[in-house]
């Protein structure tokens, strides 16, 4: 039975209802600082923690609850006679419930504050209390999540106590929270690319209907710190997002964020099927659609500019899973909302430089994101590309980095007309891209040509210019073919494998 509770919260959501309920059950409430003031001002009978400890708050609030008279009351095991004898001798009263939420370090670390100001939001007393309460969960109920208040109130109403299963779960939530909290602090202080221990701080954003396939359970977690596109987007319409939706949306958004020009990316199964740049959203959508009018069906379309009504009307003509853009004209949004299942996503955050992670069985691979497009660009053939061809070559290289290797993209006038990817050899990827394009001006490759066969195949289809990293021991073979066929070729020095 709960006789004494300690309440100290930064987030005051729901705390009055909980405190007044406890008061109605004759529970003695101890509190600190701002929480004490808030409860007292709202008519709750509450004891200042200084009355319990006999020691005033000190060091600008850094020391409030760090006292044996508090922690002895939390940690004492009730059915341990020696424990109870000791706390009685020391004048310590047991504390049966601890309600604490922490200083909002997750949020403050991203604000425009000085380093020292951010450090002040590293909570010490709160974590110490909740860890102590969680360790002694058989005797102490610990609440760190405002969403748990109602359930605990209901259990006490029904049973006069909180059952052991709930206590254990609440204790588990403490250490789950502290892992994320400590991870965020560790990463803030270390500032290391690859620390000795990889600690990640993510919070569940939503449960998903299923994973990649219906038999796989899934959930979506987002970073507790920082601003990221796939964390800060807003869903304006449509069904709940699926596991595959989020993965696809991420790649589609990253693709359009590559471009300063107005850009559109149509994507299916995590691979672009049509990408285009131009002067207006309507133009780039039309061009992206024409790249592959079959594969776009049931796919995702992303823009890096606001969507207008005319474009929305064209988008509404076909079945799409998602449309994502920085914004939508009001009348464009009304058009898209007529398709109740279409997920309309507003995403204003640009794709960020960061880390890529891939889970393997028993480990995690971590690498810098592929944010470097070119190194030392040089023409290696007798013929040089024209100005327009060079623009298309750079465009193609920006697209090919988002296609699964081996990858080839064929481009004409700012359109990725043919995309070939996921092949185990480069010539197959080239044949796939060239065949899909039908016609094209330039060809981009994510990695070097191991033989001259890709250049030979490109010549058959009338390709005028090629861009690739270079670096093969047989580079001269490809250069020779290009010179013989009148094709210009540019080496970039940067490979863009995507596995």
UniProtKB/Swiss-Prot annotation:
CDD domains in the record: IMPCH
NCBIfam families: PRK00881.1 (NF002049), purH (TIGR00355)
Top-rank taxon: Bacteria
Keyword Ligase: no
Keyword Cell membrane: no
Full protein name: Bifunctional purine biosynthesis protein PurH
Residue ranges annotated for the MGS-like domain, each copy included: 1-144
HAMAP family given in the database record: PurH
